[in-house]
Amino acid sequence: MKNYFDIKDKVAVVTGASSGLGWQIAQAYASQGAKLALFARREERLQENVAEIEKEFGTEVMYAVCDVGDYDSITAAVAKVMDAYGRIDILVNAAGMGNNKPVMDQSNDEWERHIHIDLSGVYYMCKAVGEIMIEQNYGKIINIGSIHSRVIFPGGGISAYSSAKGGVMNLTKNLAVEWAPYNITVNAIGPAVFETELTVDSIELPGFMDLIKAYCPAGRLGKPGELDGIAIYLASDASIFCTGQLICIDGGWTAI
């Protein structure tokens, strides 16, 4: 029987792979035998993660220092992957930043920086890798969105974040339509709040966990590994007819 979830030997580029959700997804792909290219800005952390994947999973892995807000940095990193592997089958856009401030406490520069990294960075990565996928007539793009592109966080203070993620969702839909003729699927995963380096400051705020328990039917944060299944599904041929979707992994948050 065919294994529809097989991604063994597929080449996967994962941004934000030095920590957080990007690193978790990279490990999930390594466990399935994918060939990995880890992108992030922190070279020392990338080197540590490459060594850990080689030791734990024995799969092929490389890294490239990459700033997703800099298109020249992206094209150089993508060229490095093509030199090593000759193709890119999967792209996961997990790089991002956090900013929990009410509008009146947020500078215009902070707003623009957030939109630049969380939205423009995804656009730049999709454009650079999409060119390769169009030429090879195949590709799987997975953008890390958020449930807060669909529902507003009850505590407020995430206008830049949720606006950027709303843009990511609309970009996902547009690319899904444009690139469907090339056998490229483009989808987004919409996590609720997960335990990562990006969210630790928010989690420690007074009353934060009370909000989580009030609005998330599961009554808790997402845990490491709980995005692995959906990330593998969207990277595999099991999802060949699924494109332009936001799939929320949120403990039931968006069900109410």
Residue ranges with predicted function:
Residues S146:
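Residue(s) in the substrate-gating loop at a strand-loop-helix junction
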Residues P102-V103, S107-I115, I141, I212:
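Substrate-binding pocket helix/loop in short-chain dehydrogenase/reductase
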